């Protein structure tokens, strides 16, 4: 294949590309069995070393880009993932994420920029085999929770099936409407050295990854638009439409306008993004257990004191956690009474409870026989040979070859890679197998093909696999054309399907004219019409939006005050003998009052300015980027991001681009630089970018979010937080009388922190007085930064809440604050008492500050109260609030 002119100009033609790739492949072949699967079928080049026709365009594109281009491509993909907020939460094997672990942090999704390209001919084989396998598993599921003929006829051993954790006794008798009992199926496959495909695992409990697959397509298509246009891979988005129609069709027969929800374990789930992104694509609300309740045998969703009927649940919570009454009692992820509602036929849950039994590794041993019995067909996709310890001859083979097999327990889910075990471990395992042979299966080690990856700007080779998806339709099963590809971890970890990155799967179109037309089952209209989608307004969702408003406002205000304090520090650190320099310790004290953390400086006559100079840089550093420092800027940003992820389906896509930039800006895990100038540059950038990001998010919320009850609650949080911050700041800066020069410097800094210095100068022509400041910052209803403006907006927001009577307790409390404020006068607030304090001003500010806290507490205990026994996602008393 001749290199293109542009590729040659780049000095990185196809021949050089292949030479580097062959070197990487040669290194793979050096691995023996103990090290990993080694090199098998090569997706990219044939046995003669020539690029396969399916990959020709990609090879040209990579050669044309060269190393620099591949580096840029990696950077672009990383940036797009960052901007879209695509995350993955790695779960420690020793933790139970489903019962809640608040120490888990989502990390960025890892996506290889180079797609895994599949020819049209290969896809025809995969699609036919995948659909057949879904039909087979559907028939098995219907039989196991129905007539059980495969058990009574002795085809399947009951001891192997019923001991598997995927079997749910409470699911017996539950029947989904329609022809199919298996709603959604995911299948992990790889290619064998002879080019055929092999199934390594089936996922039927709550299949994950379809959201990631469609997000990957969006990222890669944006990263390489020219290549995407040239190859024209078949789209994945029709699968989302097929899934949406199937969910509507799955509703109970009595439902006329079905309401569908996606039930998530929450943001600490391993695949929280996958769930939220899929819910957004489908246009269905993402809910958690706290949002749902069973009443009168029906499932309802909470909505500010009212209930809305739910007809279909797309379940992403494992079955045993779905109902703490009938299943796992300690679950905080399920809905009490959900099993009973299913038995009554008032709600459809998909995948149905009990579908996890199809993930039993022992079942693989019997699939060929089951296919012949239930479908009268031979399997089109084969599985690696499996030996069940419950059959004497197979037990002997298992024990004799335990060191070269993948050993799995059908009871605990434990998986052991035989080649990695020591002699003692192998002996111990043999004893365990002989003691309870029916609990164990041995599987021949899976084999994988290799494909190109972008490794550090160089075309490399790595083992790859695929996860493919189907969804039930009235006339059969519809596959996602493409799926979630993955790059396998090196070494023996690959045998357990451990991955290091994802890959987009590009299926080449056929040459037939109708190649891009989706099959009839996908586009068939549902028997029912789904209800219009609506925003979730349950207490949990509203609480997260409320805290989004608070944390966003807190971060904005904190960034401004930190900027002002840092700038004044640099102005006056060499002018300590001037009266104006007193503004620095006053501002530092204000930071301490607002965050509730000692800033190691005082604002009274006893402070030591030399100590202030020594402490201020480290204090400003920790208040900006130290996540363990109470009230720090990074803490507010983290709180905002956490709340946003909990309501991802409610927010604009632009939110994640802004949040990603802000999170990066305040992420600084190392110690501060020794150089004051370098440290100041880091702080200046972090503070400025955070401020810009918060202003952008405020604009996005105001202009891109529907102003429904969720937006109203977010604005309530914003108004309360701005009022709390303003009263705390003014109390710290203006309640004590100081030298006129110091007072002017303090007033100027305070106005800048309040984003009101320009309007103040325009109104007062440069004259500084506390009376004028209070007039502007407390009483001016046209100033969006004033206290009265916050109270008026807060009153209007409370009135807009559903069920507002006009005289609820929060509304009365706001009215009382408004009355108290309007009875005060700027001139009186400026008056100084005998002890040198502006006592009336301090009393007013302290009183309103306390009242605003009370309003927040009342809202938390009423409109935002979670059901009994539930906790906010931070856990009990974990939200970070400003001190009283």
Curated annotation (Swiss-Prot):
Organism (species): Mycobacterium bovis (strain ATCC BAA-935 / AF2122/97)
InterPro entries according to UniProt: ATP-dep_Glu-Cys_Ligase-2 (IPR051680), CP_ATPgrasp (IPR007302), DUF403 (IPR007296)
Pfam families: Alpha-E (PF04168), CP_ATPgrasp_1 (PF04174)
Domain of life: Bacteria
Descriptive protein name: Uncharacterized protein Mb2597
């Amino acid at each position: 294949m001749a290199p293109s002119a542009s590729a040659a100009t780049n000095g990185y033609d196809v021949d050089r590309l292949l030479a580097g790739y062959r070197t990487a492949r040669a290194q793979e072949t050096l691995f023996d069995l103990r090290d990993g699967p080694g090199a098998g079928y090569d997706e990219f080049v044939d046995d003669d070393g020539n690029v396969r026709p399916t990959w020709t365009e990609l090879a040209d594109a990579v050669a044309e880009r060269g190393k620099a281009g591949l580096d840029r491509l990696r950077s672009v993909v990383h940036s797009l993932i960052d901007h879209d907020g695509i995350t993955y939460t790695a779960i420690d094997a020793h933790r139970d994420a489903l019962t809640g672990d608040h120490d888990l942090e989502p990390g960025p999704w890892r996506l290889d920029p180079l797609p895994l390209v599949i020819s049209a001919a290969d896809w025809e084989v995969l699609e036919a085999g995948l659909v057949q396998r879904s039909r087979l598993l559907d028939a098995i599921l219907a039989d196991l929770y129905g007539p059980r003929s495969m058990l009574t006829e002795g085809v399947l051993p009951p001891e192997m099936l019923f001991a598997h954790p995927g079997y749910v006794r409470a699911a017996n008798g539950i029947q989904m409407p329609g022809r199919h009992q298996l709603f959604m199926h995911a299948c992990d496959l790889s290619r064998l050295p002879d080019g055929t495909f092999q199934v390594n695992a089936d996922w039927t409990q709550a299949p994950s990854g379809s959201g990631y697959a469609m997000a990957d397509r969006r990222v890669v298509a944006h990263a390489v638009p020219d290549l995407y246009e040239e190859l024209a891979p078949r789209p994945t988005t029709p699968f989302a439409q097929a899934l949406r129609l199937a969910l509507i069709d799955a509703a109970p027969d009595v439902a006329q306008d079905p309401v569908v929800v996606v039930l998530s374990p929450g943001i600490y789930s391993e695949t929280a993004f996958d769930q939220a992104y899929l819910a957004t694509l489908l246009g269905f609300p993402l809910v958690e257990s706290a949002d749902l309740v069973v009443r009168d045998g029906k499932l309802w969703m909470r909505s500010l004191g009212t209930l809305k009927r739910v007809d279909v649940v797309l379940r992403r919570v494992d079955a045993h956690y779905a109902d703490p009454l009938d299943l796992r009692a300690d679950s905080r992820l399920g809905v009490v009474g959900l099993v009973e509602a299913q038995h009554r036929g008032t709600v459809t849950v998909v995948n149905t409870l009990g579908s996890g039994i199809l993930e039993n590794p022992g079942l693989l041993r019997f699939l060929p026989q089951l296919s012949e019995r239930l479908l009268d067909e031979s399997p089109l996709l084969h599985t690696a040979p499996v030996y069940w310890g419950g059959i004497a001859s197979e037990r002997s083979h298992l024990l004799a070859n335990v060191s070269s097999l993948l050993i799995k327990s059908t009871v605990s889910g434990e998986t052991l890679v035989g080649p990695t075990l020591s002699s003692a471990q192998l002996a111990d395992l043999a004893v365990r197998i002989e003691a309870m042979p029916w609990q164990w299966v041995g599987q021949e080690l899976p084999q994988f093909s290799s494909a190109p990856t972008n490794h550090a700007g160089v075309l490399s080779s790595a083992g790859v696999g695929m996860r493919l998806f189907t969804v039930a339709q009235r006339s059969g099963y519809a596959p996602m054309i493409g799926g979630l590809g993955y790059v396998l971890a090196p070494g023996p970890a690959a045998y357990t399907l451990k991955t290091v990155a994802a890959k987009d799967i590009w299926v080449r179109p056929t040459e037939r004219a109708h190649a891009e037309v989706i099959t009839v089952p996908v586009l068939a209209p549902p028997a029912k019409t789904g209800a219009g989608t609506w925003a979730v307004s349950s207490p949990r969702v509203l609480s997260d939006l409320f805290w989004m408003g608070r944390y966003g406002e807190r971060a904005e205000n904190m960034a401004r005050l930190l900027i002002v304090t840092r700038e004044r520090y640099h102005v006056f650190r060499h002018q300590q003998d001037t009266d104006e320099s007193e503004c620095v310790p006053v501002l530092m004290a204000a930071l301490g009052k607002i965050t509730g953390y000692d800033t190691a400086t005082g604002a009274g006559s006893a402070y030591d300015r030399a100590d202030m100079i020594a402490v201020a840089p480290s204090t400003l550093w920790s208040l900006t980027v130290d996540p363990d420092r109470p009230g720090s800027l990074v803490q507010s940003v983290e709180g905002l991001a956490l709340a946003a992820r909990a309501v991802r389906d409610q927010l604009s896509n632009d939110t994640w681009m802004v949040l990603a930039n802000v999170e990066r800006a305040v992420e600084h895990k190392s110690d501060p630089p020794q150089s004051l100038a370098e440290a100041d540059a880091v702080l200046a950038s972090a503070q400025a970018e955070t401020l810009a990001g918060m202003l952008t998010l405020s604009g996005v919320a105001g202009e891109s979010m529907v102003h429904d009850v969720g937006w109203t609650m977010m604005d309530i949080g914003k108004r309360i937080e701005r009022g709390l911050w303003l009263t705390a700041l003014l109390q710290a800066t203006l309640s004590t009388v100081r030298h006129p020069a110091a007072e002017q410097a303090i007033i100027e800094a305070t106005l800048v922190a309040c984003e009101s210095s320009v309007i103040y100068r325009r109104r007062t022509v440069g004259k500084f007085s506390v009376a004028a400041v209070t007039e502007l910052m407390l009483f001016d209803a046209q100033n969006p930064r004033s206290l009265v403006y916050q109270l008026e907006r807060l009153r209007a927001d409370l009135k807009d809440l559903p069920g507002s009577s006009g005289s609820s307790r929060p509304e009365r409390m706001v009215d009382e604050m408004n009355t108290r404020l309007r009875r005060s006068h700027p001139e009186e607030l400026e008056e100084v008492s005998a002890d040198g304090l502006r006592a009336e001003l301090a009393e007013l500010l302290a009183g309103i500050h306390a009242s605003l806290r009370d309003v927040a507490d009342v809202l938390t205990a009423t409109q935002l109260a979670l059901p009994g026994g539930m906790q906010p996602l931070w856990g009990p008393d974990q939200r970070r609030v400003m001190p009283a």
